[in-house]
Amino acid sequence: MLHTIKPVTNARKSTKRLGRGPGSGTGKTSGKGHKGQLARSGKTLRPGFEGGQIPFFQRIPKRGFHNFSQKRYALLNLKTLESFPQDTVVTPQLLLEKKIIKDQLCGIKVLSQGTLTKKLLVKASKFSKQAQAAILAVGGNIEVI
């Protein structure tokens, strides 16, 4: 029984043998054509290289500004907080454990999307005014860390 097992047709593709005579189809120049930069050894070119002319990404105009000192916050909405049981202390560590946020970045900011009906203690870096009001309105507490 075991001696009859074979791989599915075309499951194991044989490697292309280069430079093995004219009958092989890839003899002589081994599929590299004649001369030129790409026919030489070590032919790798960086992505976006256009043969020496000014590349497209340098030709188009640049716009805007990238603030390198910008702080990025992991965002958390009230509708996500609603999934926690009553009287839970919601901390960044708890959010990471439950995989609600992937990374703390510079901290966590709580936003007001959705509704909150449970009393919670929420520890975060920032709160929007509406989120803060919603948490306090249901008897919860906030703590800026």
From Swiss-Prot:
Organism for this UniProt entry: Aster yellows witches'-broom phytoplasma (strain AYWB)
Keywords tagged on the record: Ribonucleoprotein, Ribosomal protein, RNA-binding, rRNA-binding
Record function comment: Binds to the 23S rRNA.
InterPro entries: Ribosomal_uL15 (IPR030878), Ribosomal_uL15/eL18 (IPR021131), Ribosomal_uL15/eL18_sf (IPR036227), Ribosomal_uL15_bac-type (IPR005749), Ribosomal_uL15_CS (IPR001196)
Protein name: Large ribosomal subunit protein uL15
One Pfam family from the record: Ribosomal_L27A
GO terms, biological process: translation
GO MF term list: rRNA binding; structural constituent of ribosome
UniProt biased composition (Gly residues): 20-30
Gene Ontology CC terms: cytosolic large ribosomal subunit
High-level lineage: Bacteria, Bacillati, Mycoplasmatota, Mollicutes, Acholeplasmatales
Stretches the record annotates as Disordered: 1-50
PANTHER family recorded: 50S RIBOSOMAL PROTEIN L15, LARGE RIBOSOMAL SUBUNIT PROTEIN UL15M
